[in-house]
């Protein structure tokens, strides 16, 4: 009896020690997808806001199968012609096209949450104004990257929630937000495809202007859009709107300075678990 009590006491003391010593260890004290609201308007914070917007695309939501933007890419694979759905495997609802037509489906809600939260973060970065000493190249680069990412998100939404632009530019697509939202912001109705693509081209051209001269400093920054990435997005937007000459020109600009990868370098992009 005494031994049992001693064992319980020892276990309890050990548990309390573990909890007290590491209770805060697992907390992210410097989250990459959030910024203190009190310093959001500061120009020097624009880069952190863009980083938060980007890392938001990796956020899990509602199920282990919603693994950020990668889940939406898998969803597209399932809705295309190259993948066959198997029992007991995720994305069956994508295979049946339920993910884009059923409002109550968790991936439908996830796609809107992921895209519009990222857009809202970009809107916050874009809304910051700078004058004098605050108007630095780094500030302009961060805003350019926010413009590029916002255009990328709207390209995704335009392709998923309406038929092609060439079928009907006046067709309603998705809501268009270009300003940060707050709790009292009234929901917007659907913008037309023409309105959406007008904003997309405007954002990409602005991004191209702001990112002139930007060079990624290291591999840790390769997620940040540069002018080549913006030209790639411009080529995609031109293709989707039937501007074939513009698509070719933008694609050639995007490819400048790059050579085809060797087999060895190509394999370096994959994990080797063995």
Residue ranges and their predicted role:
Residues 22-73, 251:
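Membrane-proximal, proline-rich intrinsically disordered regions
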Residues 88-161, 191, 209-211:
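Conserved, well-structured interaction surfaces
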Residues 11-20:
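Bacterial N-terminal signal peptides
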Residues 119-122, 197, 204, 251:
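Inward-facing hydrophobic residues that define packing positions of alpha-helical scaffold repeats
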Residues 160-194, 198:
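Short coil/linker segments at helix-helix boundaries
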Residues 61-68, 92-95, 224, 239-274:
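Hydrophobic-face positions in mid-chain alpha helices that act as interaction patches
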Residues 1-11:
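Bacterial N-terminal signal peptides that target proteins for export
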């Amino acid at each position: 009896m005494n031994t049992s009590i001693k064992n319980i006491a020892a276990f309890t003391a050990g548990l309390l020690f573990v909890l007290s010593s590491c209770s805060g260890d697992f907390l992210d004290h410097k989250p990459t997808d959030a910024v203190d609201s009190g310093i959001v308007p500061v120009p020097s914070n624009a880069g952190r806001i863009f980083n938060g917007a980007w890392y938001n695309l990796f956020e899990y939501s509602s199920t282990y199968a919603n693994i950020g933007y990668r889940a939406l890419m898998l969803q597209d694979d399932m809705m295309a012609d190259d993948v066959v759905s198997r029992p007991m495997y995720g994305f069956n609802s994508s295979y049946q096209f339920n993910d884009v037509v059923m409002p109550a489906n968790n991936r439908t809600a996830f796609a809107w949450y992921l895209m519009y939260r990222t857009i809202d973060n970009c809107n916050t970065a874009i809304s910051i104004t700078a004058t004098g000493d605050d108007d630095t190249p780094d500030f302009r680069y961060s805003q350019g990257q926010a413009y590029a990412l916002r255009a990328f998100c709207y390209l995704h939404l335009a392709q998923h929630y309406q038929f092609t632009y060439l079928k009907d530019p006046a067709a309603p697509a998705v809501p268009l937000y270009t300003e940060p939202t707050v709790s009292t912001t009234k929901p917007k109705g659907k913008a037309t495809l023409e309105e959406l693509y007008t904003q997309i081209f405007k954002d990409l051209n602005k991004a191209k202007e702001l990112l002139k001269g930007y060079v990624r400093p290291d591999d840790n920054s390769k997620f940040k859009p540069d002018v080549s990435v913006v030209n790639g997005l411009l080529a995609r937007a031109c293709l989707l709107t039937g501007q074939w000459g513009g698509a070719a020109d933008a694609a050639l600009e995007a490819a400048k300075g790059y050579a085809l990868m060797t087999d060895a370098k190509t394999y370096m992009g994959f994990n080797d678990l063995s």
